[in-house]
């Protein structure tokens, strides 16, 4: 399920598919691993204009992704970094959208819901190293609270600004 957010952002709710193909794809593996750990926030993603620096740094090519709509339209992108997310859930994976920009998930319908804060167990310096730029740059207007509890790194909570005030999940 896609939930469009303000500012060219969106939230995607995913679940494990009981299909052999989902176990072969890194994204399916990431979803299954998070589900097996009790569920919660699987990870986060950063939209980039150029995947080449990430391909070079990670030593592998980005892979194609797509989603077909019932009316035949197709959303297409390239992605890299899911394996990194599986190994270290504090780091994002990267997407480069291709094709028709009107199909971007944030455009599914108008939304005033705004993501305002991520609470991440981990290290800003580790994520900056992963991104190759200060972690604040791709997050723009989203605050990040870095905490380091004993346990697995990753997203602990997300705060959204709604018409009725802040909601933290």
Report residues per predicted region.
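Charged/polar, solvent-exposed surface patches and flexible loops
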Residues: 46, 56, 129
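Vicinal oxygen chelate
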Residues: 2-4, 10-15, 35, 43, ...
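Short, surface-exposed ligand-recognition loops at beta-strand->loop->(often short) alpha-helix junctions
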Residues: 48-49, 118-125
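Short, His- and charge-rich active-site/binding loops that engage polyanionic ligands
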Residues: 13, 20-23
């Amino acid at each position: 399920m896609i939930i469009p957010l303000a500012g060219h952002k969106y939230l995607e709710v995913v679940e494990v598919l009981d299909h052999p193909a989902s176990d072969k794809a890194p994204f399916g593996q990431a979803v299954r691993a998070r589900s097996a750990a009790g569920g919660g926030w699987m990870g986060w993603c950063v939209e980039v204009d150029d995947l080449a620096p990430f391909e070079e740094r990670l030593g592998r090519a980005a892979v194609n992704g797509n989603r077909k709509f019932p009316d035949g339209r197709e959303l297409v992108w390239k992605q890299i970094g899911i394996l990194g997310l599986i190994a270290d859930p504090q780091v994002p994976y990267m997407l480069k959208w291709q094709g028709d920009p009107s199909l971007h998930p944030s455009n599914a319908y108008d939304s005033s819901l705004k993501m305002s804060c991520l609470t991440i167990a981990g290290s800003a310096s580790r994520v900056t190293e992963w991104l190759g730029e200060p972690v604040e740059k791709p997050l723009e207007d989203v605050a990040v609270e870095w905490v380091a509890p004993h346990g697995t790194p990753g997203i602990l909570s997300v705060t959204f600004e709604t018409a009725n005030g802040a909601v933290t999940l």
